[in-house]
């Protein structure tokens, strides 16, 4: 099994990198894990709707270029499905039983995901109706994926 975290933007702060490295290490006991960053599009502060769409399209093209055809794509979206930790574990486990073994979780940039990326998605996942920095979402996502594996294996951790 392989899990890819595909994200717009680069981690700059050391503390985010350390948190990511810790969860990558922990997840290594359960799955192959890869994090792929695509460059975010430089954009002015007060963009028109058209400019926002252009930024999302360029970032979306970069994301789509990194998704393997056989990968099950799970996009992180505010309007996605909200699950408990146990629900995420069950969702992943059901997909694995169905023979899915390559998962790509996609985290968009500050303007969200382009429609082409949303159309490629097999499942839309939401952690909250709130907006979080994409750097923080990587850590939260990795922690929840790690927690899901612990739950699937019946190992202590998730309480």
Curated annotation (Swiss-Prot):
Q: Name one GO molecular function term.
A: rRNA (pseudouridine-N3-)-methyltransferase activity
For this protein, the record's InterPro entries field holds:
Alpha/beta_knot_MTases (IPR029028), RlmH-like (IPR003742), tRNA_m1G_MTases_N (IPR029026)
Q: Where in the cell is it found?
A: Cytoplasm
Name the residues that bind S-adenosyl-L-methionine.
76, 108, 127-132
UniProt EC number: 2.1.1.177
Keyword Cytoplasm set for record: yes
The record's annotation in Pfam families points to: SPOUT_MTase (PF02590)
Keyword vocabulary terms for this entry: Cytoplasm, Methyltransferase, rRNA processing, S-adenosyl-L-methionine, Transferase
Look at the named UniProt entry and state the broad enzyme category this protein falls under.
Answer: transferase
Q: Which domain of life is it from?
A: Bacteria
Catalysed reactions, semicolon-separated: pseudouridine(1915) in 23S rRNA + S-adenosyl-L-methionine = N(3)-methylpseudouridine(1915) in 23S rRNA + S-adenosyl-L-homocysteine + H(+)
GO cellular component terms, alphabetically, are: cytoplasm
User: NCBIfam families from the entry?
Assistant: PRK00103.1-3 (NF000985), PRK00103.1-4 (NF000986), tRNA_RlmH_YbeA (TIGR00246)
What is the protein's known function? Specifically methylates the pseudouridine at position 1915 (m3Psi1915) in 23S rRNA.
PANTHER family membership: METHYLTRANSFERASE, RIBOSOMAL RNA LARGE SUBUNIT METHYLTRANSFERASE H
The family annotation for this protein states: Belongs to the RNA methyltransferase RlmH family.
Instruction: Fill in the subunit field for this protein.
Output: Homodimer.
* This protein's name: Ribosomal RNA large subunit methyltransferase H
Q: Which organism is it from?
A: Staphylococcus carnosus (strain TM300)
Q: Provide the gene name from the record.
A: rlmH
């Amino acid at each position: 099994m392989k899990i890819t975290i595909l994200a717009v933007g680069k981690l700059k702060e050391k503390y985010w990198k350390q948190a990511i490295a810790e969860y990558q290490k922990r997840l290594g006991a359960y799955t192959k894990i890869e994090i792929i960053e695509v460059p975010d599009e430089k954009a002015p502060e007060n963009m028109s709707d058209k400019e926002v769409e252009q930024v999302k399209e360029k970032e979306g093209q970069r994301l789509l270029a990194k998704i393997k055809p056989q990968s099950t794509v799970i996009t992180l979206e505010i309007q996605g499905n909200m699950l408990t930790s146990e629900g995420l574990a069950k969702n992943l486990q059901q997909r694995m039983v169905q023979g899915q073994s390559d998962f790509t979780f996609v985290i968009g940039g500050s303007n969200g995901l382009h429609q082409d990326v949303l159309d490629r998605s097999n499942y839309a996942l939401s952690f909250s109706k709130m907006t979080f920095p994409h750097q923080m979402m990587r850590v939260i996502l990795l922690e929840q994926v790690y927690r899901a594996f612990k739950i699937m294996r019946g190992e202590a951790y998730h309480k």
